[in-house]
Regions:
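H-loop/switch region of ABC-family ATPase nucleotide-binding domains
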Residues: 59-60
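ABC ATPase "signature
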Residues: 83-84
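Catalytic Walker B motif of ABC-type/P-loop ATPase nucleotide-binding domains
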Residues: 23-26
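A short, surface-exposed alpha-helical micro-motif characterized by mixed small hydrophobic
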Residues: 65-67
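Conserved ABC ATPase signature
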Residues: 1-2
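Conserved catalytic motifs of ABC-family nucleotide-binding domains
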Residues: 19
């Protein structure tokens, strides 16, 4: 018997085996543990890059969107309310929150640090970006540059 996550991965693999030009995935990481989510998103990115495929990812997980998407289309009550590059969409955090979405947690951290005057750099949308932006800043503050 396959677990829910295994069934999801098998279904996605079956669709990918057909080598579609456009791959539409609806909440592909729902129910997956963090490692399974990371592996699946990496495979989706690799497939997209290697096969020059358009991937439409439907998700409530802004962390997933930040990690794999170049653009985001945000809908509310069946209407398109935003369609832009990830950085521009996530820069509208208050609007996203009003419709029940949020920016990635790491982006909220950057915003809060900026509000408190502790950070002046760019917002990060992934943990990897945050590490690249914040670690040098923190080292300078501690005098360990």
């Amino acid at each position: 018997e396959l677990s829910g996550g295994e069934k999801r991965r098998v279904a996605i693999a079956g669709v990918i085996a057909m080598q579609p030009r456009v791959l539409i995935l609806d909440e592909p990481t729902a129910g997956l543990d963090p490692q399974g989510r990371d592996r699946l998103l990496e495979r989706i990115q690799t497939y997209q890059r290697d096969h020059h495929t358009t991937v439409l990812l439907v998700s409530h997980s802004m962390e997933d969107i930040a990690r794999v998407a170049q653009k985001a289309l945000v809908m509310n009550k069946g209407q398109i309310v935003m369609f832009d590059e990830i950085a521009r969409v996530f820069s509208r955090a208050e609007e996203l929150e009003r419709i029940g979405l949020s920016v990635p947690a790491v982006t909220r951290i950057c915003m809060r640090l900026r509000e408190k005057g502790l950070y002046t750099g760019e917002n990060a949308y992934t943990v990897e970006q945050a590490a690249a932006y914040l670690l040098p800043h923190l080292k300078r503050r501690d005098g360990h540059a």
